[in-house]
């Protein structure tokens, strides 16, 4: 007959195995397909857009180094930019869906915001990785001839989650 401690140990081990298996299945259950879809879509946007990417940590480092750059928030003013944005960012809203053509007025306003120096470091972001606004902004900066364009895919969500400071419009 098995000792009580041996039975309890076996029950504990079986519970642990079932728990780990269940947790693994819960993490695996279809979520990776969503992650893959986001990653593939992002990679294709970067390829089509012709821009580079920058991580949250890299952007924070550039800001801390006081690197000369223009940071553009492409989110709506009232719903997002006014409430929180990366320090020093200026706002220029782009739609979520890819924009094949900009009207002349929007194109001129965006080019004016970006300035005459086509070699200037420009970082463009939106709310989060799946948001297409930053893709549109970065893609159009490249189409307008700017050569040092970065998309910050994590956007304000990643910035805030990293506990980095944000600015608000008063």
Kindly give the residue locations of the regions a language model identified.
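N-terminal secretory signal peptides that target proteins for export/translocation
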Residues: 1-4
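Sec/Tat-exported extracytoplasmic proteins
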Residues: 63-67, 78, 93, 114, ...
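Catalytic cysteine-centered active loop of the rhodanese-like fold, especially the PTP/DSP P-loop
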Residues: 105-153, 157-159
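Active-site neighborhoods of enzymes that stabilize oxyanions during catalysis
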Residues: 163-170
């Amino acid at each position: 007959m098995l000792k009580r401690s041996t039975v309890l140990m076996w029950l504990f081990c079986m519970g642990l195995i079932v728990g780990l298996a269940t947790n693994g299945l819960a993490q695996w259950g279809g979520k990776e397909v969503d992650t893959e879809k986001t990653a593939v879509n992002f990679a294709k946007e970067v390829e089509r857009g012709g821009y580079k990417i920058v991580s949250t940590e890299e952007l924070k480092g550039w800001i801390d180094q006081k690197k000369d750059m223009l940071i553009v928030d492409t989110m709506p003013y009232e719903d997002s930019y006014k409430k929180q944005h990366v320090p020093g960012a200026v706002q220029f809203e782009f739609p979520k869906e890819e924009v094949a053509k900009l009207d002349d007025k929007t194109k001129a306003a965006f080019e004016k915001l970006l300035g005459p120096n086509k070699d200037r470091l420009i970082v463009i972001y939106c709310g989060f990785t799946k948001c297409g606004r930053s893709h549109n902004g970065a893609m159009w900066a490249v189409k307008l001839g700017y050569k040092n364009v970065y998309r910050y895919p994590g956007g304000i969500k990643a910035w805030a989650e990293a506990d980095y400071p944000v600015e608000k419009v008063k």
